[in-house]
A protein has these predicted regions:
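Active-site/ligand-binding surface loops and adjacent short beta/alpha elements
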Residues: 8-83
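Beta-strand-rich recognition/accessory modules
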Residues: 75-144
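Asparagine-centered strand-capping/turn motif at beta-strand->loop junctions
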Residues: 3-5
Length: 144
């Protein structure tokens, strides 16, 4: 993202504007409705509540599809940002399951005129529900 506005560009979130635990920015995945209450798996094995606004190398989100379609898993890596704030996770399984590596969760990024912000992401979409141990092994293998 290059700022061609002719003035500073302030990139923030509802949390940087004062709303707690609402730091959704960047690439935002809204999971299927059927995944409400799905399992969140992360590096170091924190619970989903412990992940909100925190840094982790990777997270996985698993859920069952409606009726007879089985389940699936999304493995997401935090990625990188050329800006100073560390990428933090905006993640929840209820009331709406979502997953977002957030570059400005609780700290605004100020992009000066002519400056660029570079973000990298890696997401892996898997066709079944993966257990924590096997997902950790895959994350180790695929880590960028």
């Amino acid at each position: 993202l290059r700022n061609i506005r002719g003035a500073d560009l302030h990139l923030g979130s509802p949390t940087t504007a004062g709303r707690p635990a609402a730091g959704y920015t960047g690439l935002f995945l809204r999971m299927p409705r059927a995944w409400t209450g799905g399992e969140v798996i992360a590096a170091g094995d924190p619970t989903v509540g412990d992940l909100m606004g925190r840094a982790a190398d990777w997270v996985g989100f698993t859920g069952q599809h409606d009726d007879v379609d089985g389940g699936a898993t999304v493995l997401a890596f935090a990625g990188t940002s050329s800006a100073a704030p560390a990428i933090r996770w905006f993640i929840r399984s209820e009331p709406t399951p979502v997953l977002a590596p957030s570059p400005s969760f609780d700290q605004e990024i100020v992009l000066r005129d002519g400056e660029e912000l570079a973000l990298t992401h890696r997401h892996v979409f898997l066709d079944r529900v993966w257990r924590a141990a096997e997902l950790a092994e895959l994350a180790e293998e695929l880590h960028p």
